[in-house]
């Protein structure tokens, strides 16, 4: 990884690799701030982006374990506004070109991104992309309750359960947590996950007194060529003051900041053991591919991702590709748009966390190489 820092492909990276529950390697290389020559330390704070999703997934599964919601409950049981959905017809040219949904959205479908919701990010030029952006669904000034109202006025991309599309589903689940628990999302996460696991630096913004520990964010030289050297500072992504001050919208899909030790604490809590956050059956279910046989996840800008299904809150590898470690069948993993990544592979008895701040993406050649080497090092 030092080579990639020297080549200006990544500014810096922190990682921890586990064999079973034991940390066998933990290091930081490179910079937290290249311009200031600030060397990266374990206590530096990263923008988690979509690493946030696993926290909200765990919150939902805690409520499921307590019997307060069910995985196959219709969403209107918690959020009546999202009942009686409309779906865009095949080949629709306007938001009015819709038909009734064949079935309601379920909690399970929200966890697996099979609900029919979209993101309004990855599919520019489409009818739904335009609709999401005109409604400003992702506006950080919009509280979760108001975001649900905006989504209620928009059609689904496909019938619930009939496809896979990365989406605002986890933000919707954040609102479900609030409605079911009676607490704000940040309060629930703090009480049930952050405090329970001793996570002292994870939250929806970095307090002013700690902002000197926030890692600088950089753009790569070319979004389409992640191996092209060159980094440009981009601290105002995805919007000015993001992660530096509180915003009304507590984004369950991408709003948290965290550190390597905090992320490591969560990953360890998702491994079998007496101090696991969730029950063994719950963890097994989360790490089980929920998609139909042969179906893979896909992104509008990338196409299908070979060998990858989806569990409850993360991708599941059912057929490793040449980019993957050969013994990664059953690996449960996800990451964030600014270069954070976590994985758990029960079969290979390994898990890990990788933290960088290079926008955009976590499925890049340098991370693939790191993970292959990590698996080799632990015998996986």
Residues of each region from the PLM?
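Alpha-helix C-terminal capping/helix-coil junction sites
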Residues: 5, 64-65, 152, 189
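Short, surface-exposed loop or secondary-structure junction motifs
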Residues: 77, 85-326
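Generic C-terminus detector
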Residues: 358-380
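Short, conserved catalytic-motif segment at the N-terminal edge
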Residues: 1-48, 68-70, 85-96, 364, ...
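Active-site SXXK
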Residues: 1, 21, 47-78, 84-85, ...
């Amino acid at each position: 990884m030092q080579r990639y820092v020297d080549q200006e492909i990544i500014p810096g990276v922190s990682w921890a690799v586990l064999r079973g529950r034991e940390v066998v390697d933990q290091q930081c290389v490179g910079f937290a701030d290249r311009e200031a020559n600030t060397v990266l330390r374990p206590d530096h704070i990263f923008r988690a982006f979509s690493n946030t999703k696993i926290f909200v997934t765990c919150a939902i599964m805690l409520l499921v374990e307590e019997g307060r919601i069910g995985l196959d409950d219709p969403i209107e049981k918690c959020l009546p506004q999202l009942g009686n959905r409309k779906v865009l017809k095949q080949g629709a040219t306007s938001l009015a070109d819709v038909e009734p949904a064949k079935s309601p959205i379920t909690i399970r479908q929200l966890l697996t991104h099979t609900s029919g919701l979209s993101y309004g990010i990855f599919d520019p030029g489409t009818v739904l992309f335009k609709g999401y952006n005109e409604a400003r669904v992702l506006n950080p000034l919009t509280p979760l309750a108001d975001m649900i109202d905006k989504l209620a006025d928009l059609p689904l991309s496909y019938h619930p359960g009939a496809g896979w599309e990365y989406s605002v589903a986890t933000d919707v689940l954040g609102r479900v947590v609030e409605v079911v628990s009676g607490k704000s999302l940040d309060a629930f996460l703090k009480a049930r996950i952050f405090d329970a696991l001793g996570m002292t630096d994870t939250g929806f913004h970095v307090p002013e007194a700690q902002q000197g520990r926030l890692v600088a964010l950089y753009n790569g030289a070319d979004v389409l060529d992640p191996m092209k050297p060159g980094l440009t500072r981009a601290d105002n992504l995805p919007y000015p003051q993001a992660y530096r001050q509180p915003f009304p919208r507590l984004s369950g899909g991408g709003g948290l900041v965290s550190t390597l030790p905090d992320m490591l604490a969560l990953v360890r809590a998702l491994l079998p053991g007496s101090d696991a956050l969730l029950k063994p059956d719950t963890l097994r279910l989360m790490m089980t591919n929920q998609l139909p046989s042969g179906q893979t996840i896909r992104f509008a800008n990338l196409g299908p991702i070979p060998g990858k299904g989806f569990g409850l809150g993360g991708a599941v590898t059912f057929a490793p590709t040449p980019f993957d470690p050969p013994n990664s069948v059953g690996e449960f993993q996800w990451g964030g748009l600014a270069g954070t990544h976590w994985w758990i592979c029960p079969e290979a008895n390994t898990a890990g966390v990788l933290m960088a701040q290079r926008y955009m993406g976590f499925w890049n050649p340098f991370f693939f190489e790191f993970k292959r080497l990590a698996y080799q090092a632990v015998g996986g």
